[in-house]
């Protein structure tokens, strides 16, 4: 609470939930500091060093911009776009979860794993039927191929979802900046539409991620 007091947040604001906007508008720390802090909350060093690091940094940049712009809106304008902040938070959470899952799959599944396994299956299939242990090996390899194909399909689906969530967050950022630049009257429709679409996408992704988590527990 003392940290909030230093940012100009009173006890009343802390209790009624308006402290976040006040704290955001009072946060004059360098951008790089806020960027590092937010990244540390959603990703470890290994993930940030992976192929998804740049995407995560862009997502955090979008989120910080949205937070900065909405913090500077008047109270009256904020009431017109109440869902922007929670929607942006939900999208960033989904992006982080999907990037984490994809990074793990990338480590566990070599790029050429499917091709190599298909070649092994074809090689065993080409053996004479009387070849020693042919049927057992073919059954085992076919089962492995089916499992690997399922994992590759899941990876492709997660990549599409990650791209969609990233684009939704970027659209929300652009529309909220447009609102600040052109005024609420000119941009409110764009922001509302972007928020509704992003909220629906975030909800759908939440179901998918939760289902995947449950499957891993089985």
Explain the meaning of each model-derived region:
Residues 125-218:
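Long amphipathic all-alpha helical oligomerization modules
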Residues 2-128:
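Membrane-proximal, non-transmembrane interface segments of integral membrane proteins
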């Amino acid at each position: 609470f003392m940290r909030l007091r230093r940012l100009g947040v009173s006890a009343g604001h802390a209790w009624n939930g308006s402290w976040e906007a006040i704290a955001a508008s009072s946060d004059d720390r360098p951008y790089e500091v806020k960027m590092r802090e937010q990244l540390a909350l959603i990703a470890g060093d290994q993930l940030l060093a992976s192929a998804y690091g740049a995407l995560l940094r862009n997502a955090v940049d979008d989120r910080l911009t949205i937070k900065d712009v909405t913090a500077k809106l008047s109270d009256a304008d904020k009431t017109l776009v109440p869902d922007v902040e929670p929607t942006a938070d939900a999208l960033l959470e989904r992006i982080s979860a999907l990037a984490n899952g994809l990074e793990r799959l990338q480590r566990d599944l070599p790029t050429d794993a499917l091709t190599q396994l298909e070649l092994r299956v074809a090689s065993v299939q080409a053996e004479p039927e009387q070849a020693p242990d042919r049927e057992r090996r073919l059954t085992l390899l076919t089962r492995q191929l089916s499992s690997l194909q399922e994992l590759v399909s899941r990876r492709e689906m997660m990549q599409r979802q990650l791209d969609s969530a990233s684009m939704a967050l970027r659209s929300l950022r652009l529309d909220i900046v447009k609102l600040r630049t052109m005024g609420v009257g000119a941009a409110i429709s764009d922001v509302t539409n972007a928020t509704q679409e992003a909220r629906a996408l975030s909800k759908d992704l939440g179901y998918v991620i939760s289902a995947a988590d449950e499957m891993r527990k089985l």
